[in-house]
Every structure is written in structure tokens, then in C-alpha cells.
From Swiss-Prot:
<feature type="compositionally biased region" description="Acidic residues">
    <location>
        <begin position="214"/>
        <end position="291"/>
    </location>
</feature>
<keyword id="KW-0805">Transcription regulation</keyword>
<dbReference type="GO" id="GO:0006357">
    <property type="term" value="P:regulation of transcription by RNA polymerase II"/>
</dbReference>
<dbReference type="GO" id="GO:0033554">
    <property type="term" value="P:cellular response to stress"/>
</dbReference>
<dbReference type="InterPro" id="IPR050520">
    <property type="entry name" value="INO80/SWR1_helicase"/>
</dbReference>
<feature type="modified residue" description="Phosphoserine">
    <location>
        <position position="133"/>
    </location>
</feature>
<dbReference type="GO" id="GO:0042393">
    <property type="term" value="F:histone binding"/>
</dbReference>
<keyword id="KW-0804">Transcription</keyword>
<keyword id="KW-0227">DNA damage</keyword>
<feature type="modified residue" description="Phosphoserine">
    <location>
        <position position="115"/>
    </location>
</feature>
<dbReference type="GO" id="GO:0006338">
    <property type="term" value="P:chromatin remodeling"/>
</dbReference>
<dbReference type="Pfam" id="PF00176">
    <property type="entry name" value="SNF2-rel_dom"/>
</dbReference>
<dbReference type="GO" id="GO:0000722">
    <property type="term" value="P:telomere maintenance via recombination"/>
</dbReference>
<dbReference type="GO" id="GO:0031011">
    <property type="term" value="C:Ino80 complex"/>
</dbReference>
<feature type="modified residue" description="Phosphoserine">
    <location>
        <position position="610"/>
    </location>
</feature>
<dbReference type="GO" id="GO:0003677">
    <property type="term" value="F:DNA binding"/>
</dbReference>
<keyword id="KW-0597">Phosphoprotein</keyword>
Amino acid sequence: MSLAVLLNKEDKDISDFSKTTAGKSAKKNSRERVADVAPTRVLDKKQAYLSQLNSEFNRIKRRDSIEQLYQDWKFINLQEFELISEWNQQSKDWQFDNTNDSQDLHFKKLYRDMSMINKEWAEYQSFKNANLSDIINEKDADEDEEDDEDELEDGEEDMEEDEASTGRHTNGKSMRGNGIQKSRKKDAAAAAAIGKAIKDDQTHADTVVTVNGDENEDGNNGEDEDNDNDNENNNDNDNDNENENDNDSDNDDEEENGEEDEEEEEIEDLDEEDFAAFEEQDDNDDEDFNPDVEKRRKRSSSSSSSTKLSMNSLSLITSKKINKNITINSDRPKIVRELIKMCNKNKHQKIKKRRFTNCIVTDYNPIDSKLNIKITLKQYHVKRLKKLINDAKREREREEALKNNVGLDGNDLDNDEDGSESHKRRKLNNNTANGADDANKRKFNTRHGLPTYGMKMNAKEARAIQRHYDNTYTTIWKDMARKDSTKMSRLVQQIQSIRSTNFRKTSSLCAREAKKWQSKNFKQIKDFQTRARRGIREMSNFWKKNEREERDLKKKIEKEAMEQAKKEEEEKESKRQAKKLNFLLTQTELYSHFIGRKIKTNELEGNNVSSNDSESQKNIDISALAPNKNDFHAIDFDNENDEQLRLRAAENASNALAETRAKAKQFDDHANAHEEEEEEDELNFQNPTSLGEITIEQPKILACTLKEYQLKGLNWLANLYDQGINGILADEMGLGKTVQSISVLAHLAENHNIWGPFLVVTPASTLHNWVNEISKFLPQFKILPYWGNANDRKVLRKFWDRKNLRYNKNAPFHVMVTSYQMVVTDANYLQKMKWQYMILDEAQAIKSSQSSRWKNLLSFHCRNRLLLTGTPIQNSMQELWALLHFIMPSLFDSHDEFNEWFSKDIESHAEANTKLNQQQLRRLHMILKPFMLRRVKKNVQSELGDKIEIDVLCDLTQRQAKLYQVLKSQISTNYDAIENAATNDSTSNSASNSGSDQNLINAVMQFRKVCNHPDLFERADVDSPFSFTTFGKTTSMLTASVANNNSSVISNSNMNLSSMSSNNISNGKFTDLIYSSRNPIKYSLPRLIYEDLILPNYNNDVDIANKLKNVKFNIFNPSTNYELCLFLSKLTGEPSLNEFFRVSTTPLLKRVIERTNGPKNTDSLSFKTITQELLEVTRNAPSEGVMASLLNVEKHAYEREYLNCIQRGYHPNVSAPPVTIEVLGSSHVTNSINNELFDPLISQALSDIPAITQYNMHVKKGIPVEDFPKTGLFPEPLNKNFSSNISMPSMDRFITESAKLRKLDELLVKLKSEGHRVLIYFQMTKMMDLMEEYLTYRQYNHIRLDGSSKLEDRRDLVHDWQTNPEIFVFLLSTRAGGLGINLTAADTVIFYDSDWNPTIDSQAMDRAHRLGQTRQVTVYRLLVRGTIEERMRDRAKQKEQVQQVVMEGKTQEKNIKTIEVGENDSEVTREGSKSISQDGIKEAASALA
């Protein structure tokens, strides 16, 4: 029971208290009288009341401690299942050890702990049954705080041991069953005793009599309410713990208790509501109030000290709960924390402000036995308290006044008070007659008549408090009856069901534990079996592991043996392959050596064979060996030695030579089968085997003189023909390969009477060149040009379709010239012929062995094949193999072997600068020398000038750099991969065969477009505004309109046709339509507005004011300012004074025109000044020609330098003439507007006079030309740029937006001034279109040749370039204009963009650097720094190095100059000796002018 209940109850019963204590208060009308109160009596009443109140508090404390003991007992019972489960788990841990000694130790420890626990439990039971108050009273009251804390700690340790002993007491063994039952009986007895004590105490509380009759009874009821609430909260907390423990236990048996989960959730919901009510607290802002708190503390010190220890110990017991994760051996503070968490789980504090007066014991100090009480008053009680304090103050003042007032009679006052009190007492006795029996039963009686908290109140206030309390009391009980009763009933039922379930589980666990002891022997047997199985399993695993290790070791040994055998086999195979390679090389070398001695290639090239080579081959003569073909796959390379293999190689070489000779002889026999018998003696002359080693002179039928090296080439070709061997004439471009091949044909015709048929296959661009060369050097040969459309070729095929056709001097044709495309198209017809000699010009066209032209040409029947090429190797060694296999299929039959021999080493040397195997290179040269003849210009042609190569490096412009970065960001493939693809060897050949490679090449092409010119992506368009205009019609349209009677066209022509006749229109005399455009909008101005606003009137005086200003206020008017005009006349010599007035009123533009036209009055000598004479001479000068240019040098220079640079700053989007305004009945407005806009004098001066008008003026009207009005005053550049709103793309911007074009523009100016003629090579025809626009803008004479040019046009273009020196630039595509044509008229070659293949560029530049060139040739190559073009150029240098290594055996140093052009167009020139085998360009000190 709390003090708040007592206070609230006192408010209720204050009226009864006032009735029973009539002497305590007076009537309402006599309250102002002063009463003499005995101080001693009042103090006695207060002391009695306070002692009574303290006794009540002591009784409440005792009852609460007993209740806490009871709750503690319930908590222990509800936690048994969880504790037993934990003990079972620990008992299982003891059974892990299989030794009996460990078991005995565990059991001995268990027995020892159980005995100690029984002893502690007995002490605890005696402690609970003892009278705690007597025990505490025996304690020393003056003991210090440290001793009290020690006692509390001892009590906590005892309780911890009690809990642990309770846990261990129920653990494990069946022999402890009796002890468990006994302890439970003791607990049940103690719980019964506690319950009985609680009931007795409650009954005793009901019988207690307090002050003011029913006051204490109601107070007890209120106290019971609080105790009930506390008990409910404690029960709720216990139920929470029970539910949590049950949830933990139910997790082990989910199948049995699955239906109890929903019930537990409902319990948790109920607990949350109850816990919120339990946790309610008072406002912290209210002040504590107790009038006699010090006295109460003194009075309650003795009684409260008796219950101090019990309250502390029991509060610790109720706050400790066992967590399922805490073992019985855990520390007590840890267990306490876990129990607090369990109690507060899922609880939410809900603080509600009390609506009634409350009193709570906030603190109790056991040292000085002080009890702190917090009283929270509601608003009404606060006001009442203030009023009582004021009344007490006034009471004291009255008492002091009474002491000082001697005139008053104290006895009268006492009588009056006694009378009033007796009257009130009688009234109270009548009202409380029914409750007299109950009052007699009360223990205490009130005699002091004071309020419960020592204050007074009247009956009205007491009744108000009573009503308020009744309403609150009724509301609380209604809420409890409506909400809490059903909850508590369900909660009790659930607790009972859970408890029964826990009991059942506990019993089952106990039975299970009992059975474990009975099945001990069985478990030992089972353990033996388990151990046996485990041993067998471990043994099996051991043997398996042992076998696996042995197997792995055996496999390892076998693997090592196999690897060793494989290694030995690889070494053996490598030796075998080396022998095979040596065999093939020896075979080829012997064949080449024999042929080389026959045809003397070394002597023709100017080289001598080394002594080692001669020494190595002198022992074997393949001509003396019997031809025997040894199958390459049948040779045993393992058993035969090197000498035997060498002999077999010699036999194969002899066999190859015999087959070649037999083939040539068979071809000759078949060709001469139809000869007459008397010519049989000449067969030996034509037989190649009997010609012998002779020196061939130049054929007489050859209409030219061969140079010395060309005559040697003729001898070499003749020897090849005699031996029946094919060859490659690989002289450097420009040394006359064409004339040497023609001389061979002349040699065969003159010396061997072999007139054909000969086949010449050449690129399409050189067809006419070959025809011209053959007809020029061999006029006796009949040429068949085989090209054209299908019908033309069908007619040409009739020449060789004749039966028994014999080729002699009178044959229909001797040489057929065709292109590679025609060979592929008409291969079926050409294969039927047997050709004596087939010449392939620009043989790099068949560099791919997979192409259709290579396969078709290889299938042709011909005695000898001659390949003409200046670059036998362009990209890789595979191209060289393709040419060698074409001329010698029997020797060079496998590309893989050739690649294994030479390609890998040489190409890797060129790419990575690795060391080259000189022996291997020497053998390659030995193989190639008999079949290939190559001379370079510097060795054989001393009169040919040098060739200087200059690389011009430019930086990207701003627009190009942005486009380049955008392309790099949009391409998903890595940019480095694209650059590698750009530099790949097979890029130009096989890229189209692969989709991925083609995508990369397309990406590369986009980057190259950016480097060339950004306009290759998008051109700037012509910009013009929208014209909202009706245009005038020309004469042809008017003629058609008159013929068709189309009045609409004539009416819209804006021309006055009244003076025109149909004859004039038909003759076409009227063609001047200047200012003929009109606005489609016409506006008719009302006449009323025109008269009021435009015509002069009293409202509109604008015209009058202007006239008045120009006449009256003009200082140059002679009538108003005569003296000034006279003074000016004397100064200027002007006789007329009105002339000043006229000049001042004439517009400035008209005055300029009049002054330009010169003086009108030529009779006046005063105007014959020098200035007028000059003007007259200038005016009479012709408008065009040398004289006009000389007279207007300054004007032309000014216009060219300044006016041409002026461009429009604003371009309108729409243009329209002024709206036409008409006034009905008046033409003044229209005429004034037209005169203002289209003044005839100004229009005539700014524009030119039409030719027909000039004719009419001079011829028909007889006006001299010198009297024609001055025209064309508006400068031509301004007239071009500002006379129309149409904006053309700026050519200056077009030039400056490309780095290459800007540099080329500067370069061409320099070359033009120095008299050079330029060849410019391109890769893109679209770029050639842009270049033509540029050359037209700069007015350079140029011609163009590309792949779209026709054959006959190509011949004419080359002829014009060679013969017409006025042509400054020749635009060519590298593929079409770089082969087989002679362009020696040019001495400068510019590569705007380079080709994939460096040899293509080399052939293109040799179009100018060849025989016939007398000047030094300079080659410029435009490159963009930091782009993909640099990567392509580096790769091209590597390819050139491969060519140099293969053809000459070493790298050739070339003089290269590099010009670096920066952003400010400054040039940094570097010149030095550049070795192709080195990366980069070495800087030099010299600069290029």
C-alpha cells in the first residue's frame, strides 16, 4: 500500500472527519473568530498520527517482502525446465571421456557439490523462516557502511550459490531423486506458509482502524489496490520470464509444442500493456511535499531498519533470472544482467501522467534510517495546500494577537469551542450510527481531529475531493473490469498450461536420465563397436592413401620417362628436319649453281662468286650425273650420312634440269612440227641446249641503242631462254625493264626466227604505254591490243582461231598486249594458245598465291615466263615465294618450308632488330641469283640525278583534333589494336577476307580521313536566307507567256509591257530585270488616312518644316546670306552663287557620283585643272587590259589585300523587299517609295550598263563612249560579297582547317615561283575532288588521273603532261598513276597520304625519277604527328628493310630530311643519314631552305 492511496482516501473522508471532530472546526460564519489552541495538545495528536502512519508503512514493507519471497519461489519453479536442460547438456559432456578414472572424478565432484548444496539449501530455508526483523534488530545499529555492503555482498553470494545448488541439485543422476523431492516439498511448504501469511496480512489490513472512521479502511483498500497492482506487475514479469524460458525449451521440442506459439504471442501482448502500467512514473517537475517529513523519518527509522536487509536481499532475488545462454558456473553479475534483459524483453515504457495525488517512496538510507517520500499533488491539491499554508500563517498571527490582547476572555472562547464541538459531535454521531460497530473493531482511534496531512478544509471542499475521487476510482475499476480481467484470466490459464507442460517435460527428462544409468552396459558395448568401426575405417584410409601415393609415384616416373623419350624424339626429329632442309637447300643450290654458271648472272650483275661457294660446288657436276629422281619422302634421313644425302640432292637437281630441258625441247618440237623438211638444219639453231655460251649483240631490228647494263640484261634473258628457265627481271624502277624485255623478243625474232606468239600482261594504266613502246622500238612487230568490251574482244579472238596458223614475219600478230583483268575474264580462251614467251609487267600483281589471276596465269601453256618488277618483295617473304613458285614450281613447291628456311629469321630481324644469320642469308642469295637479276640506279646509271626524300610533319588543327578524339571515344575496340591493325602486313591484301579485320580497317580509314581533311566527313553548305519575294520573269518566260496567252505570268512580271511589242519580246531584246523583285504583300492605304497623315495640311507640317529649314535657315542660301556666299565664290572661283545652295541640298552619294562623272561644262577653262585632266584620262581608259591594270595598280592592290578579306558578319534567315503601298486615285506614294529605294542615278552608278543599252547609246544615238555615265563604282569584291545574302563557304577557312592542306598551300607557292612541276599522289578520290576545288581557287593549271579514267584518256593525259609545260600540278591516285607510265616532266613528287605498301609509293615516285630525268627529284611526304599515319610510316620502314636485306644483303642508307611544322607554322628541319634498320630519325645540324 502506498502513501498516495492514503492521501486520496483522506480527501474522501475529510467530511466525516470534520463531523466526528466537532471541536476541531467551527461553523462557516464563525471562522473569523480567533481560537486559542493548546500547542501541546496539537503536537500530541500529530505525534500519534505520525506513529500510526509509520506503523502502517512498516506493515506494508513486511507484507511486500513476504510477497517478494513468494514471487521468488514461483520464479524458481518456472525456471526448472531450462535449468534441467542445461544440466542434461553438461551431463553429456562428462560422457565424452571413455576412461573410468575421469568418470569417477566427475561423479566425486558431483557428489561433493550436491552435499554442499544441500547444506546451503537448508541454511537458506532456515533464513527464510526466521523472523527477519529480530535478526536485523540484533545487528549493531552503529555499524558503518562498509559492514553493510559486505553483508549485502554475502547475501548475494549466498543467493548465487542457492541458485547454482538448485541447478546442480536437479542434475543428472537418479540417486538424487529423493533429495529433489524433499527440496520441492520444502519449497511447497514455504510457499504455502507465505501464501497464508499474505492472506492473514490482508485480513489484518482490513481490520485496521485509522483516523476519521472509514478513512483507514478506504486507505487499506487503496493500499490493497497498489499491492495488487504490484503483484500483477510482478506476476507479469514472472510470466514474461516463464514464457521466454518456455520458448527456449519449446525450441527443442517444436513438434510437440507447435500449437503453443500463438498463445505465447498473446501473452507477450498482454505483458507489454501490463508492463507499461507498471513502469508509470510521476512528473519530475512537481515539488515534494510533506509537512512533518523530519518527524516521520525519525519515527520510521526504527521500524524501517528492521526490514532493510530483507528488502535488499529479496529485491536482488526477484531481479535475478537465468538466461539460457548462461551456464551455472557463470559469474553472478553476468547472470544478473541477463536476467534483467529477460525481464525487460519486448517491454515498452509508456508514461502516463497521473490524474490524482500520488506518493512514492523514492529512497531509503539504511545508515541513518531515513525514508525519502515523493508526494505529487494535482492542481486542486496544490491550490488547497497554498490556502492551508496561508490559513496556518493567519492562525499563527491570530495566536500572537491573542497573546497580546488582554481584554479577551479565554474561558468564553473555550466554552464556545466546546459548544460548537459538541454540536458537531452530535451531528456526526447521528450520521455514523450505522458504522459504530465497525469503528469499535478498529485498532486505532483518532483524537486529534486533524486532516491526514495536518491541514484543515471545509465540508464543501471535502465533498468536491470526495466526488473527484469517486469518479476516478469508478473509472479505474471499470477499465480494469473491461480490459484487465479477461487478460488476467487468459494469462492465468496459459500459465497453468505452460506449467503443466513444463512438468511433463521435466518428468520425461527425469525418466530419460534414469534410463541412462540402466543402459550403461549397453552403451559400453555400443562404444566398443563404434571404436572397432573407427579403427577399421582408419586402417582402410591408411592403406588407400599408401596405394594412392605409390600409384602417383609410379605415374610420375612414367611421365618423366615419357617426357625424356619425347625430348629425345624431338631432338631426333629436329636433326631429321635439319637434314631434310639441308637436302632441299643443297638440291636447290646445286641447280642454281649450275644454271648460274651457264647464264653468268654474277658477271652480269657485276659481282664475283665467292671462293667458298665455288669450292663447295666444284666437286659435283650435275650435268655428268645420271638423272634420277629420288622421292623426298622415301629417303631415310636417319641412317644416311651427309655425303649420301648430297649425292641424292645432286641427282634430284640433275633430274630437275633434265625435266626442264625436256620440256623446252618438247615445246620446240611441237612448235616446229609443221616446218618444212629443208628447214630441219635450223632446229639446232633454235634448240636452246646447243646454243652454247655466246655473247649476244643488240638486235638490228631494235630501233634504239641499248646501254651497257641493258645489253647485259639481254644476254641474261637470252641464256634463260636457252636453258628453258624462267626468270625475274627485278631492276630498280626507271632502268628500262620494258626495253630489255622488248629486246629479248627482237633477239628471238632476228636470231631464232621465233616471231611469236608473245603475250604481254600489264596493268590497265600501262597498256597504251606498252603498245607505244613496242611500236616505237620494234616497228616490224604486229601488235594485238586485247581489251575493250565483249564484242570487241570476240572480233580480236579471230586472229588466233585460224587452223594451222604459223607465226612468222607475216603472221597476223606477233605480240598480244592485255591486262590482268582481261586475263581473268577470258582465261578459257587464252589457255588454248601455246605462247612462246609470256611477260608479266608489274609482277607484284600476282604476289598472292591465292588470287585467281595467279592461278590462271600459272595454268597458261608457255615456254618461258619473265616477270618484270621493281619490288619483288613488298610486304613479306610470302610474296617472294609466290613469284619463285610461279617461275619454278618444282623447286619452290612448299611455302611452309620456305618460311621455315628464311622468312621467320629475316622478318623478325626487320621488326625487332635481331641478329641476322649471315650464313642463311648467303644461301638465300645463292638460290635467288640464277633466277633473278636486279641492278640499282646508283650502280649502273651515273647520269641520273639524286632523289631527295623529305618527310613533312604537321600538327592537327583544332577541328581535326576534336574529330580525332571523338572517333577514339566512339570506337569500342582498343585504339592500340587499331593502330596495330593499320600496320599489319596483310592489311592491304587479306583484310577483306575477315570481318573483324575489315572493321578495323574501316576504323583506320576514318582516322586517315581526319588527318587528310575534316571536310571529308561533312562539307560546309551554301547558306542563303528564305526569300519572301516575287521575282521578275526573264525574256524566255515572257516569250512563252505571250505565245501561250498566259496573262498571269505577264501581270506578275512587274514590267511595263505597254511599250513592249510581241516582236521585241520574241527577239529577246529585253533582258534587264534589275530591281524586278517585289514583295508578295500589297497594302492599299485608305485615301482618308493618306490625306490626313501624309499630305501636307494644318495637322501635318513635316514637308513644310523641311522646306523652311532648307531655304530660310540655310547659311548657303544667297538670298539670306549673300556676303558669305560671295566670300566662298571668291575663294573657290565658282561664278554662280546658287551652286553652293545646290551642293548643300544635294545628298552626299549623288555628289560623289557627279564628281566621279567629271565636269559637264568643258568650255569653262577654270575647271581645266590637273585633277580634272587626270579624272578625264582615267574615265576614258578602257576597263580591261594592261593599260587599265597599270592605271589602277593601287586600287587593285587595295581591293585584293583588304576588300577580298571582308566577309559578312551577319547572315539573315529571311529576306524580303518592302511591302508595296498603293493609294487609290494617287500614284504619288508609290513613286516616292520607288524613287527612294531605286533611285535611277544611284542604281546606274553602282551597277554596270547592260551591253544592249551601251550599243543603243553609242550606235543608234551617237553618244561617244567617253560621255557614258560612270558605272561600277561599287568595288567588285564588295559587290561580290555584299550584293547578295547568299553566303558561299570560305575557301580560306577550307585551307586552314587541314594541317596538310595548309602546308601544301605554302609549298605550292614556293614551287610555282621556282618553276617546278609537281605530281601529287592521293589514296582517296574524294580528297582529289577537294584538291581540285582548291587548285581552281588558287588558279593553278592542273590535270587529274585516277581509277575512273578511261584508257584512252590516260594516254592523252600522260601525253599532255609530258608536252605542255603550262600544266603546274598533276593529281594522281597512287594505284592508278603509280605504275608503268613515264612522267619525267615533273621534278617534284608530293604524297598527300601514304599507301599501305611502301613499294607502291616507291614506284609512284619513280614515275619521275627514271631514265630521261635530267633534274634532281624531290619527294615530299605529308604526315600528321601523333596519329595513325606515323605508325603506318614506321611499319613501312620495316618492310623496306626486309626488301633491302633480301635483295642486297644489307640495309641501304637513305638521305631523309624531316620538316616539323608547329602550331605557329614554323619549320624545324632535320637532315641526316637515315638507316632503315634503326627506329626514329637522327637529328642533324643542316636546315632546309
